[in-house]
Amino acid sequence: MSDKNQIAARASLIEQLLSKRNFEDLGNHLTELETIYVTKEHLQETDVVRAVYRVLKNCPSVALKNKAKCLLSKWKAVYKETHSKARNSPKLFPVRGNEENSGPSHDPSQDETLGICSSNSLSSQDVAKLSEMIVPENRAIQLKPKKEHFGDGGPESTGKRLSELLDPITPMRTKCIELLYAALTSSSADQPKADLWQNFAREIEEHVFTLYSKNIKKYKTCIRSKVANLKNPKNSHLQQNLLSGTMSPREFAEMTVMEMANKELKQLRASYTESCIQEHYLPQVIDGTQTNKIKCRRCEKYNCKVTVIDRGTLFLPSWVRNSNPDEQMMTYVICNECGEQWYHSKWVCF
């Protein structure tokens, strides 16, 4: 197996172990990468830089982090050495700004020695810059969203591009921001307010992700709920409250489904709740003894049905609990003519 295939295989295995959070076996792969001769072409044609950078950011072991930092420092020296030799050939290497040419010139071998021996030789900005330089441009383009509704139209920052390369959640969060932006602008697409809606969409998504960062399933469910409520024409009060400042993006992100409902739906739910409580007060099975000794208090006819109910089987309101607590039975009456139903608490038998 060639060195390139070995490096690609090691990078793939490291990615799998990181996704399974199996950090115990990472040391063997990092040690193997230290023994393989790595060239600039290997770094650009494989995902080994991204894999080792994820170890540096996500692994809890300090020893493995130092080993990953040493590898990145060593590869940075290799890349700079190759780049300095071919500096007069601009076609081979894309220009990434003045960052590569800035700074005093120095011996690459010294960088390699310092990077391997010192665990603090590579800062987070240097690691990010290294990953940006080595990862090919076509891979970064594949991970970008198809439509860019956000941003000022200029080149993206190094940190943002690197986070998209290393974190698979970033494209999903970008898509959620786009969905929130489309839902916020569904009622009115005024161009002067476009930037304001973009800021609202970003802030709402950030607060939702903060709430459910440990449970992506709940995060997606919450985003779908927000988008559906914002697109509902009856919930136009949500956009109005955001625009007027009555409700902040954080408050909207923390709102439940019940709180986002419009007034009509809230009243309907309240009526359903009240009717269910009233029905729960009454017995489910209406059986009893036919009698003409009781006069209905509504239609004043003598055609009723009487049954005796145990107190313990019902959730009775306070007005029923006026009799002696020793009386365990309650008399329940229903009129066969008009359907009136009531409790008769003055006596328990006939």
Swiss-Prot record:
Domain TFIIS central: from-to ranges: 172-288
Domain TFIIS N-terminal: 5-82
GO terms under biological process: DNA-templated transcription
Region (Disordered) residue spans: 88-114
InterPro entries named in the record: TF_IIS-typ, TFIIS/LEDGF_dom_sf, TFIIS_cen_dom, TFIIS_cen_dom_sf, TFIIS_N
Pfam families: Med26 (PF08711), TFIIS_M (PF07500)
GO cellular component terms listed in the entry, alphabetical order: nucleus
Name of the protein this chain belongs to: Transcription elongation factor A N-terminal and central domain-containing protein
Species the sequence originates in: Macaca fascicularis (Crab-eating macaque)
